[in-house]
């Protein structure tokens, strides 16, 4: 049991976080609400805050990144097929599974969430998620920056009804927003006709993904409820999606703001007082020196993505020049106790180019882009300062990205691909392997044509029986 002193100390810590973010609100009351929502059963609260240490992971930890529907069978819903695939072909080789958003959604293959507390019925149900969590450490996304225009909250916004009417960040279209850092090229504000008139909603990623207004503490309260529910269903590792964009402030770049870091610290305080071992991973696809700030003082993320690795590793293997990759490995400081890097070559997104800023000369970037396009890849753009479009990411299957050099395709694709994976596995940190890298999947041109989105090239859905046959045949690339 937990004594009152434990709760009092926790309330004081939470109140301190909240006062930084919400100085004009009753932060003591907010802290009490958060504790009651996060710990409806106080037996799940530990008496003393966990001390950051190195016992959260070890050299055997590997994460598999997959969609709930990446492997399919006509016999059952996809989450059950995924679990069957894991047991048959992965076993205990990989200890953690990151299932990308498995909620009802309207866009972006899951990242436009309609209902945070339900499993997409086309994938399965909560019992399927819980079954996977019994066999593997489960990682899931908290899509915290934005939600779907089809959600109940946004429909309330359109109708000017509580609580959703105050959940979204809006701005006057006449406002100068030129300082805002953009990951996309569409207009930042999306107009909507609401019951109270025309309003312009901040939409960092698409017109169907509307940004929440965290200056309203009720939005934070909602996500505390969501976190508590995910923990109950077996999630232990939380990927904070697009977290760098969380707090918006007119007249600033609206990225990496102090309030964003403080909210992460608040979540870390909650996690550090929970009886379960809970891990925060921040998804911040930004230049490396900015990315490193998300460790905080061992009081923010436990793990940050090594976003600089995929583009610099790709560049090294396509050019034969490892200078820039070596600079990265030498410049990344050894992680402090309780912190580490998530190393990867590819994910469900493209190979990001923002981390190359200041790390790779533009001429080298241009050569790499040309090679990737030769290998069938695509290049997605973002809108930079002054409205100038810049390359944002390379969209390609990582196996296809390794098919040659700047001079074109050659016979060393498999060797080059295996070298990339070996380098990634050898670096300090936790390795993460995307399912389409594990299975050496080819570019999905049909998927791109179907969706109209470049990222679909590396988000194919595979037939369970076919992939099982390929893995059983030692002569196939998949088996290699």
Q: Predicted regions: what is each one?
A:
Residues 2-480:
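Active-site and adjacent substrate-binding regions of carbohydrate-active enzymes
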């Amino acid at each position: 049991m937990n004594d009152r002193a434990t709760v009092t100390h926790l309330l004081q810590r939470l109140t301190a976080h909240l006062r930084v973010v919400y100085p004009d609100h009753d932060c003591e009351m907010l802290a009490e609400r958060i504790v009651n929502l996060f710990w409806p059963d106080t037996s799940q609260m530990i008496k003393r805050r966990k001390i950051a240490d190195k016992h959260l992971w070890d050299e055997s930890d590997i994460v598999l990144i997959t969609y709930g529907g990446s492997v399919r069978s006509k016999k059952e819903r996809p989450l059950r097929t995924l679990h069957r695939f894991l047991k048959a072909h992965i076993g205990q080789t990989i200890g953690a599974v990151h299932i990308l958003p498995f909620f009802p959604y309207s866009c972006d293959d899951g990242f436009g969430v309609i209902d945070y507390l339900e499993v997409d019925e086309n994938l399965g149900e909560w019992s399927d998620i819980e079954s996977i969590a019994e066999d593997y450490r489960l990682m899931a996304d908290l899509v915290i920056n934005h939600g779907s225009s089809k959600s109940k909250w946004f429909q309330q916004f359109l109708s000017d009804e509580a609580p959703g009417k105050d959940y979204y960040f809006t701005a006057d279209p006449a406002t100068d927003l030129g300082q805002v850092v953009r990951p996309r090229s569409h207009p930042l504000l999306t107009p909507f006709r609401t019951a109270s008139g025309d309003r312009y909603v901040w939409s960092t990623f698409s017109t169907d993904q509307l940004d929440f207004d965290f200056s309203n503490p009720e939005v934070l309260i909602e996500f505390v409820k969501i976190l508590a529910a995910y923990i109950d269903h077996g999630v232990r590792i939380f990927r904070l999606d697009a977290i760098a964009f969380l707090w918006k402030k007119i007249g600033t770049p609206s990225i990496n703001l102090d309030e964003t870091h403080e909210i992460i610290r608040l979540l870390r305080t909650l996690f550090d007082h929970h009886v379960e071992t809970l891990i925060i991973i921040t998804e911040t696809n930004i230049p490396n020196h900015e990315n490193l700030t998300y460790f905080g003082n061992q009081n923010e993320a436990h793990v940050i993505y090594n976003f600089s690795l995929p583009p610099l590793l790709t560049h090294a293997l396509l050019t034969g020049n490892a200078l820039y990759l070596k600079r990265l490995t030498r410049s990344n400081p050894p992680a402090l106790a309780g912190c580490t890097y998530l190393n990867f070559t590819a994910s469900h997104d493209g190979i990001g180019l923002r981390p190359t800023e200041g790390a790779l000369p533009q001429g080298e970037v241009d050569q790499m882009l040309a090679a990737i396009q030769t290998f069938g890849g695509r290049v997605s753009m973002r809108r930079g300062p002054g409205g100038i479009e810049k390359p944002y990411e390379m969209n390609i299957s990582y196996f296809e990205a390794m098919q040659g050099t700047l001079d074109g395709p050659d016979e060393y694709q498999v060797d080059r691909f295996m070298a990339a994976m070996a380098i990634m596995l050898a670096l300090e940190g936790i390795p993460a392997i995307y399912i389409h890298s594990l299975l050496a999947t080819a570019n999905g041109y049909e998927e791109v044509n179907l969706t109209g989105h470049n990222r679909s090239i590396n988000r194919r859905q595979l037939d369970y029986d076919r992939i099982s046959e390929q893995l059983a045949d030692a002569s196939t690339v998949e088996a290699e």
